[in-house]
């Protein structure tokens, strides 16, 4: 009996719709699994719920009635990753010792295709894209899933069983895994993030660790040797360990020495030939090389991608040059570490556009990275904190505007030729935008309006 056939005996409650919940409910229903959906949004305002109801799926909207567990004899709960574990339905499932999944676990049960699981506090999307592009260039059957694009359960449901499924994984998604076993796992780094969700760093690290906790001796775990937290988390892994380091040569893995990138002491490419901007991306590149080499990828494919790939949209993305000013969109930088790495990528005079949702952070940790910042344009809930930061650093041009759209011309007006104008907010976007992509698109459009 395969993993999916076993699910046919279960009664599944899908909690929260969004993209992943809708996909999970639809796929389970198509496979003949008894599925019920519960979503907080009222039915009459809830188009996804209406569509699922039309398919014949039981939908309960507008509240979270605990009677569902008895009425539907629920045996598995699949929750939207963003729903906190304090939710009454999740708490009831845990009280009843019912497994709580995210759709990543469901995806694992839907296919025999091997997974490559990529997680970390920063760099996930860039690294996931590099891995996908390298394997694709090597003519290997490869799919990409998770936070980066298509919902993982949809990708898995349509997989043939012999493709690599390259999957970007958040801590939210990994918390809801029970048996998920990637063939190759990767933790890029660990930095304090999402503590409003996980409450403690220990719980956050425990979620990240689940990317390799179920791996076997014939699986691969790729480890950042420069991050003590990652090294410690990997100690209990049964998988074969492959390391990468930007600081020192490593025997089993990837490293940089004398201006060149090596894997297992074999020269891959000179650093000067890599087009991806920023020293911080060297970590992502080394990690990607470790993964794809263990997937059988050729050096030619790796070199081709590294000499042509200029960055992922919203991740230190080069937008345009206008009157000798270069504009970069780093809207994905939703925490301090990501923005510090973006600032480290430039030695030119820089005007920083920053601000957003206030999660209680102070931004003093940015100070060592702001030596090239000549001006700041700030917006959102954290704007007063950034104004204070700029004043403390003696930055001459510090301006508070309403939004990103206003920030772009304000930055241009104080800029000079050869300056970098960088959107790297160091904050989530949810105070003013639905997503960081929406914020980044506003920046790009505002840049184009300068022409």
Swiss-Prot record:
Location relative to the cell: Cytoplasm
Organism this protein belongs to: Bacillus pumilus (strain SAFR-032)
InterPro entries: Mur-like_cat_sf, Mur_ligase_C, Mur_ligase_C_dom_sf, Mur_ligase_cen, MurD
Cytoplasm is among the record's keywords: yes
Name of the top EC class for this enzyme: ligase
Reaction(s) the record says it catalyses: UDP-N-acetyl-alpha-D-muramoyl-L-alanine + D-glutamate + ATP = UDP-N-acetyl-alpha-D-muramoyl-L-alanyl-D-glutamate + ADP + phosphate + H(+)
Record protein name field: UDP-N-acetylmuramoylalanine--D-glutamate ligase
Any GO BP: regulation of cell shape
Pathway in which the depicted protein is active: Cell wall biogenesis; peptidoglycan biosynthesis
A GO term for molecular function: ATP binding
Family the entry assigns: Belongs to the MurCDEF family.
Alphabetical list of PANTHER family matching this protein: UDP-N-ACETYLMURAMOYLALANINE--D-GLUTAMATE LIGASE (PTHR43692:SF1)
General function of this protein: Cell wall formation. Catalyzes the addition of glutamate to the nucleotide precursor UDP-N-acetylmuramoyl-L-alanine (UMA).
Keywords: ATP-binding, Cell cycle, Cell division, Cell shape, Cell wall biogenesis/degradation, Cytoplasm, Ligase, Nucleotide-binding, Peptidoglycan synthesis
TM regions (residue ranges): none
Binding-site residues, ATP: 120-126
Assigned EC number: 6.3.2.9
Record's GO cellular component terms: cytoplasm
Keyword Transferase: no
């Amino acid at each position: 009996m395969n993993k999916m056939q076993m699910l046919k005996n279960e009664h599944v409650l899908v909690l929260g719709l969004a993209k992943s919940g809708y996909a999970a409910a639809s796929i389970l229903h198509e496979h003949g699994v008894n599925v019920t959906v519960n979503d907080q949004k009222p039915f009459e305002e809830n188009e996804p719920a209406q569509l699922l109801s039309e398919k014949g799926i039981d939908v309960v909207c507008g509240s979270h009635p605990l009677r569902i567990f008895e009425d539907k004899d629920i045996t598995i709960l699949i929750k939207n990753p963003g729903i906190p574990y304090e939710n009454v339905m999740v708490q009831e499932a845990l009280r009843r010792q019912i497994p709580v999944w995210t759709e990543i676990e469901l995806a694992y049960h839907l296919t025999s295709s091997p997974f490559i699981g990529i997680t970390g506090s920063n760099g996930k999307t860039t690294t996931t894209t590099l891995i996908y592009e390298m394997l694709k260039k090597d003519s290997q059957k490869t799919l990409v899933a998770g936070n980066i694009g298509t919902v993982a359960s949809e990708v898995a449901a349509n997989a043939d069983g012999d493709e690599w499924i390259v999957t970007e994984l958040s801590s939210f998604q990994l918390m809801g895994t029970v048996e998920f076993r990637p063939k190759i796992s990767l933790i890029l780094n660990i930095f304090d993030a999402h503590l409003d969700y996980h409450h403690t760093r220990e719980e956050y690290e425990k979620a990240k660790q689940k990317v390799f906790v179920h791996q076997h001796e014939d699986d691969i775990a790729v480890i950042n040797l420069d991050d003590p937290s990652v090294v410690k988390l990997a100690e209990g892994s049964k998988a074969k360990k492959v390391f990468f380091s930007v600081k020192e040569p490593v025997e089993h893995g990837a490293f940089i020495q004398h201006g060149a990138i090596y894997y297992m002491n074999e020269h891959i490419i000179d650093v000067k030939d890599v087009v991806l901007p920023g020293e911080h991306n060297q970590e992502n590149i080394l990690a990607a090389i470790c993964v794809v080499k263990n997937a059988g990828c050729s050096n030619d494919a790796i070199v081709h991608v590294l000499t042509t790939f200029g960055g992922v949209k919203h991740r230190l993305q080069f937008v345009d040059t206008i009157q000798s000013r270069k504009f970069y969109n780093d809207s994905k930088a939703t925490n301090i570490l990501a923005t510090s790495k973006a600032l480290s990528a430039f030695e030119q005079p820089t005007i920083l556009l920053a601000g957003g949702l206030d999660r209680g952070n102070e931004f003093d940790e940015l100070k060592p990275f702001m030596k090239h910042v000549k001006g700041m344009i700030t917006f959102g809930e954290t704007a007063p904190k950034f104004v204070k930061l700029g004043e403390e650093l003696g930055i001459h041009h510090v301006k508070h505007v309403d939004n990103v759209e206003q920030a772009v011309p304000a930055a241009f007006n104080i800029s000079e030729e050869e300056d970098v104008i960088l959107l790297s907010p160091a904050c989530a976007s949810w105070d003013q935008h639905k997503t960081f992509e929406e914020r980044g698109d506003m920046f790009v459009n505002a840049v184009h309006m300068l022409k």
